């Protein structure tokens, strides 16, 4: 049986997802839909699928499925886009929205130009754990492990241009030290409180940007004495401003949310 599903493709600093309002269009097998629809040659093309739904604990809920069908705990770029979607499609008139995710309740603050959401600030909460990883000499670098509700491994290098991310990303993502796999970031300090970062996302591979990865990189940079608490993280798809509040310990992330197009696709269940 096939049904027509309305979707919106959006991106946050180039991290592109397919968004579906499951209050209108429920999807029974989102893992399958994510794999089929994310394919660039035979589907819509994206880094994954984001489902907007009901929550008893917040204004709305968010579920994220990577391009390989695995479910993600959290995505900062997707949460910003959801804020834009909810406001501009009339699901809410609030400019502060609570969002129920697998890594907890997130608070979105919308920054408007008239009736258009230009940027969104997300309270990403407190980094859950940090650790230094030396790989027992297997690799010629030290890395910092940071959890932002999902796992990240941040490595600082002198020149990010020489990093073969296609080779190192999957090696580190699937390293035995990380049985649940990890997201992988390589970063370079390029100026006072400015970081250049590239990312290999767990379940998606190389992407243009990663919001939680930018947050994890900012945390790692400050913990290792490289930057202050407010930084700009420059990624292939754009720049995010990350602030780590000293009083509360919370990380906030501010950046753009962009609608690409609306469409309808057939769902076979």
From Swiss-Prot:
One of its GO terms (cellular component) is cytosol. Pathway: Amino-acid biosynthesis; L-lysine biosynthesis via DAP pathway; DL-2,6-diaminopimelate from LL-2,6-diaminopimelate: step 1/1. It comes from the Bacteria. It catalyses: (2S,6S)-2,6-diaminopimelate = meso-2,6-diaminopimelate. The record marks 152, 201 as: Could be important to modulate the pK values of the two catalytic cysteine residues. Keywords: Amino-acid biosynthesis, Cytoplasm, Isomerase, Lysine biosynthesis. The keyword Cytoplasm applies. Pfam families: DAP_epimerase. One of its GO terms (molecular function) is diaminopimelate epimerase activity. The active site is at 75 (proton donor), 210 (proton acceptor). GO terms for biological process: lysine biosynthetic process via diaminopimelate. It is found in: Cytoplasm. Its EC number is 5.1.1.7. The keyword Iron-sulfur does not apply. InterPro entries: DAP_epimerase_AS, DAP_epimerase_DapF. It is an enzyme of class 5 (isomerase). Substrate binds at residues 15, 66, 76-77, 150, 183, 201-202, 211-212. HAMAP family: DAP_epimerase. Homodimer. Catalyzes the stereoinversion of LL-2,6-diaminopimelate (L,L-DAP) to meso-diaminopimelate (meso-DAP), a precursor of L-lysine and an essential component of the bacterial peptidoglycan. Belongs to the diaminopimelate epimerase family. This is Diaminopimelate epimerase. It comes from Bacteroides fragilis (strain YCH46).
